[in-house]
Amino acid sequence: MPAIMKGWIDRILAPGFGFNPITKNAYDTGFFKGKSAMLVTTTGSPKEMYSEGGGHGDLNKHLESITHFFFEFMGMKVLPSHIIYEASSMSRERGAEELEKYKKSLLDI
């Protein structure tokens, strides 16, 4: 996990900010109820490597630990993750296409 993400998680999940351990404000009664969250990530490998049976396993299953234990825990609605595969080797044209797909996914929220 990147250090910047770990720092964000530590601040968000500080007792009294992201949840309250005394009043048990979590999941359906979380402080962030009514908010939405989307994970956006890139990979260096092809999509096939991140599918069930692929070398790395289903990426969406790996991301569930973040979406469930952080976003859902705080009461957020989890939106589908936006994943860009093979980002390190993409052409400018494909980069522009991926950017348009990402813009569309944001506009469709």
Identify what each model region corresponds to:
Residues M49-I109:
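Glycine-rich phosphate/pyrophosphate-binding loop and the adjoining helix
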Residues M1-T67:
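Helix-loop-strand module that forms the ligand-binding subsite of alpha/beta enzymes
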